[in-house]
Amino acid sequence: MVLLHVLFEHAVGYALLALKEVEEISLLQPQVEESVLNLGKFHNIVRLVAFCPFASSQVALENANAVSEGVVHEDLRLLLETHLPSKKKKVLLGVGDPKIGAAIQEELGYNCQTGGVIAEILRGVRLHFHNLVKGLTDLSACKAQLGLGHSYSRAKVKFNVNRVDNMIIQSISLLDQLDKDINTFSMRVREWYGYHFPELVKIINDNATYCRLAQFIGNRRELNEEKLEKLEELTMDGAKAKAILDASRSSMGMDISAIDLINIESFSSRVVSLSEYRQSLHTYLRSKMSQVAPSLSALIGEAVGARLIAHAGSLTNLAKYPASTVQILGAEKALFRALKTRGNTPKYGLIFHSTFIGRAAAKNKGRISRYLANKCSIASRIDCFSEVPTSVFGEKLREQVEERLSFYETGEIPRKNLDVMKEAMVQAEEAAAEITRKLEKQEKKRLKKEKKRLAALALASSENSSSTPEECEETSEKPKKKKKQKPQEVPQENGMEDPSIPFSKPKKKKSFSKEELMSSDLEETAGSTSLPKRKKSSPKEETVNDPEEAGHRSGSKKKRKFSKEEPVSSGPEEAAGKSSSKKKKKFHKASQED
């Protein structure tokens, strides 16, 4: 009997399921199709043998890449070798992907089957998977699939933020719309303010400058010599400023109320802000085009190149277009009208706005437009598919167009394309090396800054974490020092050596003589048995026979000890101690006098 198992790959892990006999399943294929939708009937056909969950999202991505490439991952190998029967001839494994089935059959030796009833079983498993695996909900399964799908797509598609052409499409569309709006609003300001100061329209032609002047002047009767300097700043022409001042004194315009002037000034300020935003947007578009399509920008200009990209839909679509399509791009209406009426087709579309076609003679406009479209197609392909974008090729292509234009006018033979491209390749390699070196420097600087920041954070965190243990150590060291001081004081009292105390006072010698004599008399009379008793009774009564060690003791403490030791000694010992001490005193005085 051949056992049929089904392998199901999910975003959360691998699942191995067992089915009934192959013959029985194949005979009941219509019943299988019906029972797939019903969970109860599906449980009678399929049972879960093993489930191997992925440890992390990175492991899930690795397994997904392996399955898509037809490679048996170690996790899949471990699952199949562990849970499938050892007799491989009696096992039939159903898989959804023929590539992974062929890899399993080649590496592990299991017979694999795809299609037919296996596809229906996998459809049912996919539908009821969250019910087959314990602890898995439909929501968590959907989240896992979504996350794995995003990570898998990011790995497959090389996405570069700096090469996004969507911003160029939106920017050029907004720029065209702003031009229309600024023109319309400026005409409205001219008509509105013209009732009060009609002579200003004839003096100033620029819309933005007119709106600034209308905002600054306001009531023309208030214009005087003091405002002449500001007028020169706005018009950037002293003669025009003087003419405006003279015209305001003899203007034929009607008077206007204050509320009307407020509305005119408010609307003029809006138009001025729109014109300023238009300038900043144009600067942004130029910088974006130099990043995304530097060769096309160098060849035909930022505005025309952006319009070509926007009309094509993307830089990739523009690179796919042939030169004939690029030539008439933007003139589709005229093209289809000419085809319909069997007239002459247009010679150029959006590329007409470039300076080359305007400089060419009437008979050469078609020829130069065809040549320019060819170079634009090459430049767009270089920009689209080059790893390091550079404007070297665009500059060389522009030189070729200039040479062709001069050839049409003067007959001067241009350089060959092969020589120009060889020169461009050398310069492009140098420019690419320079760009990569700059990028590496920037990356190194960024990494250094990041390391410094992390080191500062680590130092601050270590200081914060070590502040509390240090406080604990300080508090614990204080009682330890007190404990250490006690035994240090005891030997000083008992007559231990302390080199820090100077040997200067003569009183210490007197006390030392008394102590030494008493200790010697006690040793002679008491014998060996009396010494341990004395130590047990009072440890402070221990004496030191070395005169150097005993000389360091303080006089007051020794007197106290001597008074304490008097009752301990017996009567005859006491008398002997007194007599010996008197003799010692006399001897000590004689030694001092000598």
Curated annotation (Swiss-Prot):
Its main location: nucleus. Residues 292-410 form the Nop domain. Residues 457-469 have a biased composition (Low complexity). The modification Phosphothreonine is found at residue 468. There is a cross-link at residues 87, 230, 240, 540, 564 (Glycyl lysine isopeptide (Lys-Gly) (interchain with G-Cter in SUMO2)). Residues 457-594 are annotated as: Disordered. InterPro entries: Nop56/Nop58 (IPR045056), NOP58/56_N (IPR012974), Nop_C (IPR042239), Nop_dom (IPR002687), Nop_dom_sf (IPR036070), NOSIC (IPR012976). One of its GO terms (molecular function) is snoRNA binding. This is Nucleolar protein 56. Keywords: Acetylation, Cytoplasm, Isopeptide bond, Methylation, Nucleus, Phosphoprotein, Ribosome biogenesis, Ubl conjugation. Residues 580-594 have a biased composition (Basic residues). PROSITE patterns: NOP (PS51358). The modification N6-acetyllysine is found at residue 561. One of its GO terms (cellular component) is cytoplasm. Belongs to the NOP5/NOP56 family. GO terms for biological process: ribosomal small subunit biogenesis. The modification Omega-N-methylarginine is found at residue 359. The keyword Transcription does not apply.
